[in-house]
Amino acid sequence: MRPMASKEAQLEALLYAAGDDGLETDNLLQLLEISPSALRELANHLKDRLKNDENSGLQLICINHTYKLTTSAECGDVISKFFQKDLSKNLSQSALEILSIIAYRQPITRVEIDDLRGVNSSGALQTLVWRGLIKVNGKKDVPGHPNLYVTTDYFLQYFNYESLADLPVIEEFEADDNPVNLFDQDEQNSKEINFDEGE
């Protein structure tokens, strides 16, 4: 009879089986029959093990209280080839501007974005959808029923945020003469993710 897998192995297997959707904290607590503190300990240990294993192409992340196994940044080039698109390509200034508007004003329609920017945003919107950073989330109850756009979990992952609450507070920059890049990828990529959630 094979011995029962460790809790860490069970966590890894569950997240692998869950795929892109991942598993929420409450589901993992029930499935693994452990406490929130024990889950955090397991998650941090698994995260460190994957990070320190040069032969592993996976990483563990937690976004909006949902744990996921994803491919590591170091494997980005080969994954890009697989999907035949360059996920590491920098976003244009207009795309970042639109992404900022959606992040802070979501859900929002294209017309509302156009009104704020003063120019047509259709092309950049499609790029952001294609890149998986935004998605359509229903339609606005007005004539024409335009699509409503919101950011995705991949948006949080891409910029190394754990939730929308981590976005900079706009008021903090109102008195600052220096321009602020809300999505400074170099700065965000240096941010260490910790799984210390509130119990």
From Swiss-Prot:
GO terms for cellular component: cytoplasm. Disulfide bonds: none annotated. It is found in: Cytoplasm. It comes from the Bacteria. GO terms for biological process: cell division; chromosome separation; DNA replication. The keyword Zinc does not apply. Keywords: Cell cycle, Cell division, Chromosome partition, Cytoplasm. PANTHER family: SEGREGATION AND CONDENSATION PROTEIN B. Belongs to the ScpB family. Participates in chromosomal partition during cell division. May act via the formation of a condensin-like complex containing Smc and ScpA that pull DNA away from mid-cell into both cell halves. Homodimer. Homodimerization may be required to stabilize the binding of ScpA to the Smc head domains. Component of a cohesin-like complex composed of ScpA, ScpB and the Smc homodimer, in which ScpA and ScpB bind to the head domain of Smc. The presence of the three proteins is required for the association of the complex with DNA. This is Segregation and condensation protein B.
